[in-house]
Amino acid sequence: MAQRYDELPHYGGMDGVGVPASMYGDPHAPRPIPPVHHLNHGPPLHATQHYGAHAPHPNVMPASMGSAVNDALKRDKDAIYGHPLFPLLALVFEKCELATCTPREPGVAGGDVCSSDSFNEDIAVFAKQVRAEKPLFSSNPELDNLMIQAIQVLRFHLLELEKVHELCDNFCHRYISCLKGKMPIDLVIDERDGSSKSDHEELSGSSTNLADHNPSSWRDHDDATSTHSAGTPGPSSGGHASQSGDNSSEQGDGLDNSVASPGTGDDDDPDKDKKRQKKRGIFPKVATNIMRAWLFQHLTHPYPSEEQKKQLAQDTGLTILQVNNWFINARRRIVQPMIDQSNRAGFLLDPSVSQGAAYSPEGQPMGSFVLDGQQHMGIRPAGLQSMPGDYVSQGGPMGMGMAQPSYTPPQMTPHPTQLRHGPPMHSYLPSHPHHPAMVMHGGPPTHPGMTMSAQSPTMLNSVDPNVGGQVMDIHAQ
């Protein structure tokens, strides 16, 4: 260590290093400029050239004076190197260097060599060793104070480096924990592999809908945004839609808790049972029967409220999320096929379960009637354009057909003027003179071939239901 300091260049003209000021001359006297030999802008300056012109006589330091300065510096360095505390100062300096380049893993040898605890141990060992050999301080108190302050400064550096290391380790630990929590890579890979294989096996059993692959959060949003839909039609009088709903209901027995996957839900081979149950939960028959009963009781609006979901969850022993996912899939797999088949068959909708406008496949209300005084849209929806006028559900004040579930429409007597297919499409336009709203003076429009049971009480009293077929647009002749 002392040899490294000996190699440092020695500079002349240093004040205040314990050497008498008389050796350096007057500190306010002009100093000569040392010769510069590495510049090529002119000849080297003469040693007698000095700063300023106010000094009448140049003050040149003799050679003996320079050697005296070097001797004084050497004595000071020797005093520092020979101080009893210098080995401790060098040790702390090396610890500061090691703190920036040594691995900090607990299992690595020498990882704690630069810690603050090791510094305290080193001080204790050093104090015991030095006291046994020689005292800790020298005869120069100024030098002793300098050594102690230097050791304290390096000690502060070591503590600050240790704080930085702790912050770095804490950040790395929290960052890795956050990544593990947000991205469970192993679980994601296993789930992806299992779902792809299972989907490939189940695709032959049922058709795939794009909406069935949405995460549960998207489906919750779809459930919340579709609550404004109008009522859905029930089973047709011919029983075809009811049979389709029963067959489709088997597809909703087993539903995925996180991602709704296509499939029939029926139990396959026993060797696939464990993998199937791991991928999606198979609900008990009792639970599915309870939820299916609620669904058929509320076909007009198959969207349970939050309180109803909680009650269903308590009755079935499932979670609210499972109940919510079951109804999302049931609306697609049970209700929607019933609507599609009913629209294709064109049967008369049962008023006990259909209380208004049809439920379109796009999830939008199909009703075309509005409140009195509002602008009448007049355009029949796409789902009802292919149906005859006799099959259009009865429209109430809200266009929802507020018929009671126990109500049965009376049989209409045949009439020669009864129109089986209703007026043409252009008569439903608001600007057409044959618009039903103009005939009824802004009230709910009637349709040829429909009874007047869903109209206002005054019309019920003034019109005989048995001659409902004669109530028609007088301009449609």
Curated annotation (Swiss-Prot):
Tissue expression pattern: Displays spatially restricted expression patterns in the developing nervous system, limbs, face, and in various viscera. In adult, it is mainly expressed in the brain and female genital tract, with a different distribution of the alternative splice forms in these organs. Lower expression in lung and only basal level in heart, liver, kidney, spleen, and testis. Expressed in pancreatic islets (beta-cells only).
Gene Ontology terms for molecular function: DNA binding; DNA-binding transcription activator activity, RNA polymerase II-specific; RNA polymerase II cis-regulatory region sequence-specific DNA binding; sequence-specific DNA binding; transcription factor binding
Transcriptional activation domain: region residues: 340-477
Keyword flag Kinase: no
Residues annotated to bind DNA: 276-338
GO cellular component: a single term: perinuclear region of cytoplasm
Induction: By retinoic acid.
Localization of this protein: Nucleus; Cytoplasm, Perinuclear region
Location of the region described as Interaction with DNA in the Swiss-Prot/TrEMBL record: 299-333
Composition bias, Polar residues: 204-217, 239-251
Keywords, sorted A to Z: Activator, Cytoplasm, Developmental protein, DNA-binding, Homeobox, Nucleus, Transcription, Transcription regulation
InterPro entries per UniProt: HD (IPR001356), Homeodomain-like_sf (IPR009057), KN_HD (IPR008422), PKNOX/Meis_N (IPR032453), TALE_homeobox (IPR050224)
Compositional bias annotation for Basic and acidic residues: 193-203
Predominant localisation class: nucleus
Description of how the protein assembles with itself and partners: Monomer and homodimer. Heterodimer with HOXB13. Isoform Meis2A interacts with TLX1. Isoform Meis2B interacts with HOXA13 and PBX1 isoform PBX1b. Isoform Meis2D interacts with SP1, SP3 and KLF4. Isoform Meis2D interacts with PBX1 isoform PBX1a; the interaction partially relieves MEIS2 autoinhibition. Isoform Meis2B is part of a PDX1:PBX1b:MEIS2b complex; Meis2B is recruited by PBX1b and can be replaced by isoform Meis2D in a small fraction of complexes. Can form trimeric complexes including HOXB8 and PBX2 or PBX3.
Job description of the protein: Involved in transcriptional regulation. Binds to HOX or PBX proteins to form dimers, or to a DNA-bound dimer of PBX and HOX proteins and thought to have a role in stabilization of the homeoprotein-DNA complex. Isoform Meis2B is required for the activity of a PDX1:PBX1b:MEIS2b complex in pancreatic acinar cells involved in the transcriptional activation of the ELA1 enhancer; the complex binds to the enhancer B element and cooperates with the transcription factor 1 complex (PTF1) bound to the enhancer A element; MEIS2 is not involved in complex DNA-binding.
Protein name according to UniProt: Homeobox protein Meis2
Species this protein is from: Mus musculus (Mouse)
Name of the gene encoding the protein in the UniProt record: Meis2
